[in-house]
Amino acid sequence: MKKEWKEKQTSLGNAIIISAVTLIIGLAIGFASPNIFSNFAPYLGLSSSSSDINWSALDEVYNKLASTYNGEIDKSVVIDGAKKGLVDALGDKYTIYMNSEAASDFNDELHGNVGSGVGIEMGLRDGYVRVLRTLPDNPAKEAGILAGDIIYKVNDEEVYSLSTDEIASKVRGETGSEVTITVVRDGEEKSFTMKRETINNVSAFVEYDGQTAIITITRFDNDTGTMVQGFAKEFSDHGVNKVILDLRDNGGGYVSAAQDLLSLWLSGEKILIQKSKHYGDSTTSTKTGKAILSDMKTIVLVNGSTASASEITAGALQDYKKATIVGETTYGKGVVQNLFDLSGGTMLKVTTADWHTPLDRSINGVGITPDIEIERTYEDINTMKDPQMEKAKSL
């Protein structure tokens, strides 16, 4: 039966139900001890003395499965399932457990070490993971994959229900090896077979259009702030009198990188307010020093995939009236995650706080509304048209 591709939304209630089932299955299928918690709490990062969770219900499920389940049990897989289930049951899409492989991929991607792939950037749009753009001179672009395509299969495995990170890990592989990606475009399936290549994916680069400097930032990693500060120091040599900061399709990264970037426009100013149940309220400010772009005419480009640290940047520049924001309403990720390294190379990413802009605006689930709203369609992207950039250049 042919699958119908419609925009979809998963309700929070359904997500919690699914996650709760995952938790029970993850805990139940593999333990050989009659007491789950006391034997495996150390693997979960918990202690029996400090926990007030009643684990007897899970013990009951386990005991029944332990006496009836017909199959081999892999303890490491079960422990990973238990950890993932505990986290997924929270129903927070930003709080995730990563096994050692996923954690390694996450760190590599955050630092731009994506290895070998086909050169596509993906993100969640209208309920599906879609191609946001294809990188120039890379296999996906040459094969004909387009922005807006839904990622349906990788090597004949259906992946459309997986997360962006999970799909990305399946697309990557050995340099020179083949991968077949099936996409859905206008309701029709199209398959593309490509050879993986080493992908060079820097976090920031600058181009010049006359006296306008166009800075594109694809993510906020450890080097981003330093790179852009280096660009800015050369602006006088190019006679720059306007900066366009392109944050479109930038899903964020390190808050500290946004802090370094904003120090080009703000000196010792508050850039966000954090509100946390466990850590209390706090503020983050830029370093005190010469903000060399403080008086520079600045336009920031944003869209629906501009999120997290990118929204911190756009929100602060908008609040302080240091820039004109152009494009589409941003994603609306007004929460902060901290990374915690766990045993065995695993990792926990946990939502630890809400964040507001310097003027105490909450953007979570709402996004930042541009000062000038202009849409850029998938058709525009695929035909190399950019009305948002053209507007920014005209200001």
What name fits each language-model region?
Residues 68-130, 178-179, 186-193:
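Extended, small/polar residue-biased N-terminal targeting/export presequences
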Residues 83, 116-135, 211-217, 292, ...:
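PDZ/PDZ-like groove recognition
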Residues 53-60, 64, 77, 81, ...:
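Extracytoplasmic/secreted proteins, especially bacterial periplasmic and envelope-associated proteins
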Residues 337-341, 348-379:
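Conserved P-loop NTPase
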Residues 2-96:
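Terminal targeting/pro-maturation regions of precursor/exported proteins
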Residues 132, 141-143, 147, 155, ...:
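Cleft-lining beta-strand/loop regions that shape enzyme active-site pockets
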Residues 51, 113-153, 157-161, 222-225, ...:
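PDZ/PDZ-like domain segments forming the peptide/carboxylate-binding groove
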